[in-house]
């Protein structure tokens, strides 16, 4: 049994990652009360920040990884970007619900013809011997004109992001989403690496 620590407390991310990293004899552990300020200026810096913090907490001798991801919109100068999770407080200095955050984006995009956007996911892995590796995934699409008004899957900005097939990410099941999403792409690369490095397969 191999052990791998994930530097997050985001339940939605945990569920997606567990679905992708479905490797026999891999024990994926998520720390409790893990809270690190994301002070990096890029997704890569933030994912490494989380991984390094957890690596130190675990006395520098466990395999760990951190992940940072977000939505980048061309017409908004690639915002919300690294502020995706906290775009409400960054933009309005107050907390909003997920639907309200999505509506904020739609309001900002109201008169924009260019609706191109992409989701990006960056993974930073630190092996127990201190080796650092990085994995990245991107899905390109566009911002929808309205919110989903039906019961849907997904979380965050999934309900306003249209894929190239003109489907919202929130219309896809977890399995369908993981086949094409930024997180799915990045973690599939990571999974291949883990199978080779930890399990020699």
Swiss-Prot record:
<feature type="binding site">
    <location>
        <position position="69"/>
    </location>
    <ligand>
        <name>substrate</name>
    </ligand>
</feature>
<keyword id="KW-0460">Magnesium</keyword>
<protein>
    <recommendedName>
        <fullName>dITP/XTP pyrophosphatase</fullName>
        <ecNumber>3.6.1.66</ecNumber>
    </recommendedName>
</protein>
<keyword id="KW-0546">Nucleotide metabolism</keyword>
<dbReference type="GO" id="GO:0009146">
    <property type="term" value="P:purine nucleoside triphosphate catabolic process"/>
</dbReference>
<dbReference type="GO" id="GO:0036220">
    <property type="term" value="F:ITP diphosphatase activity"/>
</dbReference>
<dbReference type="GO" id="GO:0009117">
    <property type="term" value="P:nucleotide metabolic process"/>
</dbReference>
<dbReference type="InterPro" id="IPR020922">
    <property type="entry name" value="dITP/XTP_pyrophosphatase"/>
</dbReference>
<feature type="binding site">
    <location>
        <begin position="155"/>
        <end position="158"/>
    </location>
    <ligand>
        <name>substrate</name>
    </ligand>
</feature>
<dbReference type="InterPro" id="IPR002637">
    <property type="entry name" value="RdgB/HAM1"/>
</dbReference>
<dbReference type="GO" id="GO:0005829">
    <property type="term" value="C:cytosol"/>
</dbReference>
<comment type="function">
    <text>Pyrophosphatase that catalyzes the hydrolysis of nucleoside triphosphates to their monophosphate derivatives, with a high preference for the non-canonical purine nucleotides XTP (xanthosine triphosphate), dITP (deoxyinosine triphosphate) and ITP. Seems to function as a house-cleaning enzyme that removes non-canonical purine nucleotides from the nucleotide pool, thus preventing their incorporation into DNA/RNA and avoiding chromosomal lesions.</text>
</comment>
<keyword id="KW-0479">Metal-binding</keyword>
<comment type="similarity">
    <text>Belongs to the HAM1 NTPase family.</text>
</comment>
<feature type="binding site">
    <location>
        <begin position="182"/>
        <end position="183"/>
    </location>
    <ligand>
        <name>substrate</name>
    </ligand>
</feature>
<feature type="binding site">
    <location>
        <position position="68"/>
    </location>
    <ligand>
        <name>Mg(2+)</name>
    </ligand>
</feature>
<feature type="active site" description="Proton acceptor">
    <location>
        <position position="68"/>
    </location>
</feature>
<feature type="binding site">
    <location>
        <position position="177"/>
    </location>
    <ligand>
        <name>substrate</name>
    </ligand>
</feature>
<dbReference type="GO" id="GO:0017111">
    <property type="term" value="F:ribonucleoside triphosphate phosphatase activity"/>
</dbReference>
<dbReference type="InterPro" id="IPR029001">
    <property type="entry name" value="ITPase-like_fam"/>
</dbReference>
<keyword id="KW-0378">Hydrolase</keyword>
<feature type="binding site">
    <location>
        <begin position="8"/>
        <end position="13"/>
    </location>
    <ligand>
        <name>substrate</name>
    </ligand>
</feature>
<dbReference type="GO" id="GO:0046872">
    <property type="term" value="F:metal ion binding"/>
</dbReference>
<dbReference type="GO" id="GO:0035870">
    <property type="term" value="F:dITP diphosphatase activity"/>
</dbReference>
<dbReference type="Pfam" id="PF01725">
    <property type="entry name" value="Ham1p_like"/>
</dbReference>
<keyword id="KW-0547">Nucleotide-binding</keyword>
<dbReference type="GO" id="GO:0036222">
    <property type="term" value="F:XTP diphosphatase activity"/>
</dbReference>
<comment type="subunit">
    <text>Homodimer.</text>
</comment>
<dbReference type="GO" id="GO:0000166">
    <property type="term" value="F:nucleotide binding"/>
</dbReference>
């Amino acid at each position: 049994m191999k052990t791998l620590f994930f530097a997050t407390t985001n339940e939605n991310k945990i569920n997606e990652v567990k679905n992708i990293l479905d490797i026999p004899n891999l024990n994926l552990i998520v720390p409790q009360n893990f809270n690190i300020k994301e002070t990096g200026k890029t997704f890569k810096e933030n994912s490494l920040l989380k991984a390094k913090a957890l690596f130190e907490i675990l006395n520098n001798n466990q395999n760990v990884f951190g992940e940072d991801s977000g939505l980048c919109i061309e017409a908004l100068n690639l915002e919300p970007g690294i502020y995706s999770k906290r775009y409400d407080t960054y933009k309005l200095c107050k907390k909003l619900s997920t639907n309200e955050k999505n509506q904020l984006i739609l309001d900002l995009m109201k008169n924009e013809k260019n609706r191109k956007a992409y989701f990006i996911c960056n993974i930073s892995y630190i092996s127990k011997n201190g080796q650092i590796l990085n994995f990245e995934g991107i899905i390109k699409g566009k911002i929808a004109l309205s919110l989903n008004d039906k019961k849907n899957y997904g979380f965050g900005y999934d309900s306003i992001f249209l894929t190239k097939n003109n489907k919202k990410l929130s219309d896809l099941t977890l399995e369908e989403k993981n086949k094409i999403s930024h997180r799915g792409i990045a973690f599939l690369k990571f999974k291949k690496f883990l199978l080779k490095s930890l399990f020699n397969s």
